[in-house]
A protein has these predicted regions:
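CE4/NodB-like, metal-dependent polysaccharide N-deacetylase domain
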Residues: 128-152, 245-261
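Alpha-helical scaffolding segments of alpha/beta enzyme cores, especially the outer helices
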Residues: 130, 134-141, 160-163, 167, ...
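Alpha-helix termination/capping residues and helix-transition junctions
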Residues: 64-66, 144, 167, 212, ...
Length: 506
């Protein structure tokens, strides 16, 4: 019987750049580091590129790049920051994907991710499509190959999202066990209810979609993943390995894969020295002849699904109420502020949805005067974001415009695309995840909203801000009255920084 182990790490930080300056400003809560990207890189992303393995005498016997042996995804916006600020770590991650491909039968371990961590079931169809395309194109530019799998933010899923992934050529994604509804053997047998996390997580499943397409799904081992993320498994790498081995069963007379998925930041940021426990665990498994490490692409090629699965629609890995954490006061919170209310989430979502619809309407109307296919151009705009050189910009418009554009028309076309980009960044999931609307993550998505509204006003003199702020008044804060007050205190001053800088420079 063939036994395999796969450890997946979801490595992600939200986009943190000031949308007017294009830089990450100092974040005092990340002290002694400049900002949270810098701090978490020092505590997690960098250590995992060169993690020491210790012997019984606490001597270093080997230093390993953990990314070469695990399955992983990095958020595109995080990699963009890392490429500019920690090129050493960035290059080590890219190299790890190449080395993992050599190790795992030509299957690199890196997965793509939806671009800015938008909760896909709550997005409209055009945003779902663009987010997936941007994630794929970003991945191709960095890893120089097409991704086999794609991570969905918060593992939040619905059938339409799976349809889009399958249509784009994505072979698989990873979900939590309680996101499976029922299973059956392919070709015969009856459907069997596996809701409540009762699915067998030791094999791949085929999800057949209404369009006739299909996509493979892996449902991770929930109990072991929970122990890694919130228990004490990372106190000892050997115990970590033993726990993974306990996931196999002699009752299954077939190949098995025991696989787990957690936030990658668990290995060093949330759990100090977690990278070392991971390194020792992987080292221990490497020297165990009864089992071998694999990644999802390799396993899927060798052992295609024998069973079909239907998902629980609008479900995720981090909200017991489906996807309500990102649009309502469902009861999910960090636990750090007992007694606080998250009743601000619904009004914030309503304000963002209203703004998105206004922005999209402006884009659709004016972009059609310049572009042959405004939606396709938006999907391709990631190419300019990845390479904003003047030559690339010119070629981009030559390809997508339906006539030669004058200088002012080109400028307006790019403003329209930047407006659309910011209107998608407002949906970064962290804006709703935490406990109060005044948190840095929520303020950040409101800054993207302000930038989108600013561009809309520059383009057509349409002032969206008064209505947006009025809607924010309905979002109560546990600290600062309401969302409108927070917008006034924490968003508007940042919007004025570029103007102040310009005036001082003369």
């Amino acid at each position: 019987m063939e036994l395999y182990i796969c450890i997946h790490g979801h490595f992600y930080q939200p986009p943190r750049e000031n949308p007017w300056l294009g830089i990450v400003e100092q974040q005092e809560s990340a002290a002694p580091y400049h900002d949270w990207n810098e701090r978490i890189t020092a505590e997690c992303y960098a250590p995992n590129t060169a993690s020491p393995i210790l012997n019984g005498d606490q001597q270093v016997i080997q230093t390993v790049n953990n990314y070469t042996k695990i399955s992983f995804n990095f958020g595109p916006t995080l990699l963009s920051w890392m490429e500019r600020h920690r090129a050493d770590v960035y290059q080590a991650i890219l190299a790890a994907d190449q080395l993992s491909g050599e190790r795992f039968s030509g299957h690199g371990s890196a997965l793509a991710q939806v671009y800015n961590h938008m909760i896909m079931p709550l997005a409209n169809s055009r945003d779902k499509e663009t987010q997936a395309i941007w994630g794929i194109k970003d991945f191709q530019k960095r890893f120089a190959r097409f991704p086999e799998g794609m991570w969905l933010p918060e593992a939040a899923v619905d059938v339409e999202t799976l349809e889009i992934l399958a249509a784009l050529g994505i072979k698989f994604t990873i979900l939590a066990p309680y996101q499976a509804r029922r299973v059956k053997e392919i070709g015969h047998g009856e459907w069997r209810d596996v809701s409540g996390g009762r699915i067998d997580p030791t094999m791949a499943y085929l999800c057949c979609l209404p369009s006739g397409r299909s996509i493979s799904l892996f449902f991770y081992n929930g109990l072991i993943s929970q122990d890694v993320a919130f228990g004490d498994l990372l106190n000892n790498g050997e115990l970590f390995a033993e726990k993974l081995l306990s996931g196999f069963s002699d009752q299954r007379n077939r190949p098995q894969i025991v696989h787990i998925a957690t936030d990658g930041e668990t290995y060093g940021h949330y759990r100090r020295f977690g990278d070392m426990a991971l390194a020792y665990c992987l080292h221990s498994i490497d020297f165990n002849d009864s089992v071998r490490l694999t990644n999802y692409g390799e396993y899927l090629e060798n052992y295609p699904p024998s069973h079909m699965v239907e998902i629980v629609e609008n479900s995720s890995w981090s909200c017991a109420h489906g996807v309500e954490r990102w649009r309502d006061n469902c009861g999910c919170h960090t636990g750090m502020h007992p007694g606080w209310s998250q009743s601000w989430r619904r009004p914030l979502r309503k304000a963002m949805d209203w703004l998105r619809d206004q922005i999209d309407s402006i884009y659709d109307e004016e972009a059609a005067t310049y572009l042959s296919d405004p939606r396709e151009t938006r999907n391709n705009y990631i190419e300019v974001m990845l390479d904003p050189s003047s030559g690339r910009v010119e070629r981009f418009l030559e390809t997508d415009a339906h006539r030669k554009l004058a200088s002012k028309e080109r400028e307006r076309a790019f403003k329209l695309l930047e407006m659309e980009k910011n209107a998608m960044l407002i949906y970064t999931s962290c804006g709703w995840f935490f406990d109060d609307i005044s948190g840095i993550e929520t303020v950040q998505v409101m800054r993207y909203a302000a930038k989108a509204m600013e561009l809309a006003e520059e383009l057509g003199g349409i002032r969206l801000e008064p209505e947006y702020v009025r809607m924010l008044k309905a979002a109560p804060s546990n600290l600062h009255q309401n969302g409108a007050k927070i917008y006034e205190l924490l968003v508007k001053p940042r919007q004025k920084l570029p103007l102040l800088a310009k005036s001082r420079l003369g």
